[in-house]
From Swiss-Prot:
Pathway: tRNA modification; tRNA-queuosine biosynthesis. The keyword Transferase applies. It catalyses: 7-aminomethyl-7-carbaguanosine(34) in tRNA + S-adenosyl-L-methionine = epoxyqueuosine(34) in tRNA + adenine + L-methionine + 2 H(+). Its EC number is 2.4.99.17. This is S-adenosylmethionine:tRNA ribosyltransferase-isomerase. Transfers and isomerizes the ribose moiety from AdoMet to the 7-aminomethyl group of 7-deazaguanine (preQ1-tRNA) to give epoxyqueuosine (oQ-tRNA). GO terms for biological process: queuosine biosynthetic process; tRNA wobble guanine modification. Keywords: Cytoplasm, Queuosine biosynthesis, S-adenosyl-L-methionine, Transferase. InterPro entries: QueA (IPR003699), QueA_dom1 (IPR042118), QueA_dom2 (IPR042119), QueA_sf (IPR036100). Belongs to the QueA family. It is an enzyme of class 2 (transferase). The lineage of its organism: Bacteria, Bacillati, Bacillota, Bacilli, Lactobacillales. It is found in: Cytoplasm.
Amino acid sequence: MNTADFDFDLPEELIAQTPLEKRDASRLLVVDKETGAFSDQHFDQIIDQLQPGDALVMNNTRVLPARLYGIKPETGGHVELLLLKNTQGDDWEVLAKPAKRLRVGAQISFGDGRLTATVIEELEHGGRIVRFSYEGIFLEVLESLGEMPLPPYIHEKLADRERYQTVYAKENGSAAAPTAGLHFTEELLEQIAAKGVKLVYLTLHVGLGTFRPVSVDSLDDHEMHSEFYSLSEEAAQTLRQVKANGGRVIAVGTTSIRTLETIGSKFQGQIQADSGWTNIFIKPGYNWKVVDAFSTNFHLPKSTLVMLVSAFAGRSLTLEAYEHAIAERYRFFSFGDAMFIK
């Protein structure tokens, strides 16, 4: 299949620039992949799609305020760093702008100078490994100096940075939010649990590759970026029990899907506690191992995320659902509306 097979025309005004005042006030397009039927609802009605004995699986990663603005003390030149992943100790892989003058040994100072970085390795495409020096606790320093790394298609300033976190965000490490989870409120999760649905958490730290366009014509030539994931023994046990009792595993978002399917693929369809790095690319023709239904936001044309949805619902039904969403003026991308596919 070709990348162009997953293209569609999206009016720019449908790209949501800010979150709605109330998280669960967003809209929900319910898609039945067996009948091909669509139903326009509001997100808080997702509870009607869940049955007692099901498991709702969410990604509890927390977005780091990973964009840092600094200067090179020797020249006064401005530098922007985007933290991608912690490689070891105080060493981080970053995306640097402008990168060409940041050679090994270059120093960068941030804020009042209580955070500094030294370039220790040069990577391709503007990537660098830097070693940070600071006083105190790194995450606290980052909270005070860093900015939220909002996606490139969002041009508005975010008034409250917590709105780019899920209410259950816990494990620091993402460069982007698992946006399907942004719609849930604590109250809605309490109602879902009270219905007899198991709430299960896993971790996948979202990398910037999530926004990277597919640059090859054939899907067979595309290589996914790697992201760190983790599923605890307690979570794995709950999911095994849900499956054994005939319940469904319902994933919130593509990051939860990719974690569960990575584990299912690794352990011959079994759900085991595991952690590691995944670069799984779920595209049409994929043989599903774990996930029975899922919620997700509306994604970019020609993205691997539209391909993932198509792998579950079929390409033509997925593109039909997107046409319906555009005609009905649904809001798209990170701060946009959601779909539930069963």
